[in-house]
Amino acid sequence: MKIDVLTLFPNMFTGVLNESILKRAQEKGAVTFQLVNFREFADNKHQTVDDYPYGGGAGMVLKPQPIFDAVDHVTKQSEHRPRVILLCPQGERYTQKKAEELAKERHIIFICGHYEGYDERIREHLVTDEISIGDYVLTGGELAAMVVIDSVVRLLPGVLGNEHSSMLDSYSSGLLEHPHYTRPADFRGMKVPDVLLSGNHRLIEEWRQKESLRRTWLRRPDLLETYELTEQQKKWIEQWKKNER
């Protein structure tokens, strides 16, 4: 996969892209990154990338020209048609399902904005996706791009040490992940559930499925609105409801 990041602050990505999973992914050849400062594409001597909004109002708006030209530049270098992603609070709410969709792409371009917003022509004629990582406002799109990049790259084949790790993560199954424990079995009187020490793989798997569902039911019941429950899962939930009364 090839990932281009269009940003006014490329140095923000230096540490993130050279540590942990993202560093390993590059070493394995699973992904390449290019940081592009779109200020360098501004067609004026002062390299201005923003201007006052038509009609008045507070703040400055990113001009279309530098961003269009920067996207044209990286697209000409590509063998594949890219997904062009705009990070903004108005975008589609980001989910694990979206991460899995993007992980199938060969080339992704992220546009990180600043100031009051983008010229609307960027949205209408350049981008393929608008993504928001939550209902809050950040100073710019860089942090949001880092979140999306990390969640996508870890899904690429061969990136994680355990090929099943990404599939077992919270949200990949539609439910939150079950609790985890490691040694010691008794820490300051806090004990690991007996079933995990039993060696009975069938009971362990049942416990994990049940705890995954319970955690989702308690913490993110909204996820169950679109999740297709089995008959057994429905019985578990009914029992928990009775215990609450």
UniProtKB/Swiss-Prot annotation:
Its main location: cytoplasm. It is an enzyme of class 2 (transferase). Keywords: Cytoplasm, Methyltransferase, S-adenosyl-L-methionine, Transferase, tRNA processing. It comes from the Bacteria. CDD domains: TrmD-like. PANTHER family: TRNA (GUANINE-N(1)-)-METHYLTRANSFERASE. Belongs to the RNA methyltransferase TrmD family. Specifically methylates guanosine-37 in various tRNAs. This is tRNA (guanine-N(1)-)-methyltransferase. It comes from Anoxybacillus flavithermus (strain DSM 21510 / WK1).
